[in-house]
């Protein structure tokens, strides 16, 4: 709870253009007022609870995201921000479908269930599923160098682990996520029937982390899945001794596009209204969670910053605008 308050305070203070070494009494009093209001009167957790518990997951193109859109707009209107509006755009519609199935199939080893989630934007297998021998790669470059004949009709497993030694998790994520975003398309190009990707996470449990993958328009598409950490370890260990076969089944599919809206609210600048400071978050989330951390928190923080400044009597010279973006995830 303290972390959310500190983030709100930091965002609020950063919008007040003062130098601490030459701070006037008025500046100090304003910061003290913001601190007290953020700690004592914060509404952010109340809004976040409604967003996550009452509305829930908010994937683009779903009724839940539309509900979150109108809830956020109504909230900013009730707070009497100077301007509140919706910015229309087109968003993709992707359906996960039935619960995914994935298991190792071996006459010698038996059958082992693997924990998977279909990647966002991916196609399904249909009701019969697909089965193939697994080949393991640790980079897109390694797969690129393989002869297509070695990949054809195989299931490619991208097994490069999360870089746990990295000081910043964002850097570790960035150094690993390429195999999820671009790996399946490359595997499809080389003739694979499906792709598995080690979840992009430092967690050592077996909960797969979904995320988006991208296929170019008109490109051949294959089913692709995020694989839980423990399932990834198991598959890698078994496949190290001799190639194993895996069966996958999913019914996910793309359903075109539909209308979506960015939600925008602002405090209009008194002196330079056309110079705009933007803060924001993305309102959408994946379909298998509540989207609290990613990124409901960023949305309610942005609204709360404007509320704090307004309720404290702060009159910005430049426009301060909060934008809740509608489609970051896929």
Specify the residue positions occupied by each region the protein language model found.
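Soluble metallo-hydrolase cores and metallopeptidase-like ectodomains found primarily
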Residues: 29-30, 105-107, 113-117, 121-148, ...
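Short helix-loop-beta-strand segments that form the rim/entrance of peptidase-like active sites
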Residues: 46, 307-330
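A conserved hydrophobic secondary-structure block that centers on an alpha-helix together
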Residues: 139-204
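Stable alpha-helical elements in mature extracytoplasmic
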Residues: 26-30, 43-47, 55, 64-72, ...
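Bacterial Sec-dependent N-terminal signal peptides
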Residues: 1-26
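Acidic, glycine-rich active-site loops and adjacent beta-strand->loop/helix elements
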Residues: 162-163, 201-202, 283-285, 323-330
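N-terminal capping segment at the start of a domain
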Residues: 26-62, 207-212, 284
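Noncatalytic luminal/extracellular "stalk/propeptide" segments of secretory-pathway proteins
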Residues: 49, 53-155, 159-167
């Amino acid at each position: 709870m303290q972390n959310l308050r500190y983030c709100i305070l930091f965002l609020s203070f950063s919008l007040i253009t003062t130098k601490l070494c030459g701070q006037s009494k008025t500046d100090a009093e304003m910061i003290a007022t913001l601190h007290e209001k953020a700690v004592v009167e914060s509404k952010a957790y109340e809004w976040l609870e409604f967003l996550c518990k009452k509305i829930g997951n908010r994937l683009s193109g779903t009724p839940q995201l539309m509900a979150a859109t109108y809830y956020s707009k109504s909230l900013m209107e009730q707070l009497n921000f100077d301007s509140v509006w919706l910015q229309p755009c087109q968003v993709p519609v992707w359906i996960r479908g039935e619960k995914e199935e994935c298991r190792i199939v071996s006459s010698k080893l038996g059958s082992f269930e693997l924990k998977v989630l279909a990647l966002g934007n991916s196609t399904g297998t249909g009701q019969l599923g697909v089965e193939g021998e697994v080949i393991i790669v640790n980079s897109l470059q390694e797969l690129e160098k393989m002869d297509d004949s070695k990949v054809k009709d195989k299931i490619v497993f991208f097994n490069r682990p999360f870089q746990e030694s990295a000081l910043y998790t964002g850097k570790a994520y960035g150094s690993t996520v390429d195999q999820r975003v671009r790996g399946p398309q490359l595997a499809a190009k080389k003739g694979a029937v499906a792709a598995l990707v080690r979840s992009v996470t430092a967690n050592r449990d077996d909960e797969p982390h979904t995320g988006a993958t991208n296929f170019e328009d008109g490109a051949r598409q294959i089913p692709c899945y995020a694989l839980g950490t423990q399932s990834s370890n198991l598959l890698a260990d078994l496949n190290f001794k001799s190639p194993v076969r895996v069966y996958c089944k999913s019914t996910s599919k793309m359903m075109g596009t539909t209308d979506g809206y960015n939600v925008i609210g602002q405090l209009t600048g008194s002196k330079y209204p056309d110079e705009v400071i933007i803060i924001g978050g993305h309102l959408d989330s994946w379909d298998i969670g509540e989207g609290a951390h990613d990124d409901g928190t960023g949305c309610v923080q942005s609204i709360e910053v404007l509320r704090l400044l307004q309720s404290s009597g702060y009159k910005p010279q430049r426009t301060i605008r909060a934008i809740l973006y509608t489609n970051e995830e896929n």
